[in-house]
Amino acid sequence: MAEISAKLVKELRDKTGAGMMDCKKALQESNGDMEAAITWLRQKGLASAGKKAGRVTSEGLVDSYIHTGGRIGVLVEVNCETDFVARNEKFKTLVQDIAKQIAACPNVEFVSLDDIPAEYKEKERQIALGSDALKGKPPEVQEKIVAGKLEKTLKELCLLYQPFIRDQSKTVEELVKEHIAELGENIRIRRFQRFVLGEGIEKQETNLAEEVAAQTQAMRAAAQTAAAAETAPPEVSEPEPAAAVTAEEPTPEPVAAAEQPAEPVSELVEQPGAESKGFGAATKKSGGKSRSNKKKK
């Protein structure tokens, strides 16, 4: 196989607009032949996909897939440029195939390498640096080994680099590029979420044998209690003494006091002048009676 230089890859990219990795693969498949590489890219539908990669994708479709039994579910958003393509049956089929792909890939967490956080990449790099396979090797060799191992590890986490479940000869990324060339618009997998029934819930471990034994023992105890209740003689309770009936004397009803009519105030109170005259007249009258009584005696 002829050596593929970066200059040759760049030249093929400028001619076709395909991605760098696609151009490199095309040159490898064609043994460095430029025309054969262009033909290979056109057959794969990748020659024009790279030119559309920078276009804005604001339309598209959000679709779902529920696996048989309802234990795995997927939500995915795939974008395109126009609603015309979004309503296309081929585009809808593509989105549904991508959702099924996600359901079949439990280790996939990201769409592409660009979506992986830098902290996560550095963590994986440190793990790769601690490998025993690097011991005794020159630093430059170690760096190459780490770079290759890191790329492989990270790609296993990305959806675009997984073999397509319906055709293992191509990746999901190549599948998308084929539809870009066929539908004439840029297509991008934006995001997805995979759901697994019971994921993250701590399940209580139970011993089936112990559980059955406990249930059997409880049933026996209940049966023994019921049998004992049936054979025991009925309890005769003593009659309660009758409550003494006491005749209560009727409470006499209070008798209202007879009201005496009050003297009219007008008879008791007279004019000041009249009061003094009356008093004097009464005195004279009584005095006259006394003198007559003395004469009789």
Curated annotation (Swiss-Prot):
One of its GO terms (molecular function) is translation elongation factor activity. Its main location: cytoplasm. The keyword Protein biosynthesis applies. It comes from the Bacteria. It is found in: Cytoplasm. One of its GO terms (cellular component) is cytoplasm. Keywords: Cytoplasm, Elongation factor, Protein biosynthesis. Residues 286-297 have a biased composition (Basic residues). Residues 223-265 have a biased composition (Low complexity). Residues 223-297 are annotated as: Disordered. It holds the Pfam family EF_TS. Residues 82-85 are annotated as: Involved in Mg(2+) ion dislocation from EF-Tu. The keyword Protease does not apply. Belongs to the EF-Ts family. Associates with the EF-Tu.GDP complex and induces the exchange of GDP to GTP. It remains bound to the aminoacyl-tRNA.EF-Tu.GTP complex up to the GTP hydrolysis stage on the ribosome. NCBIfam families: tsf. This is Elongation factor Ts. The gene is tsf.
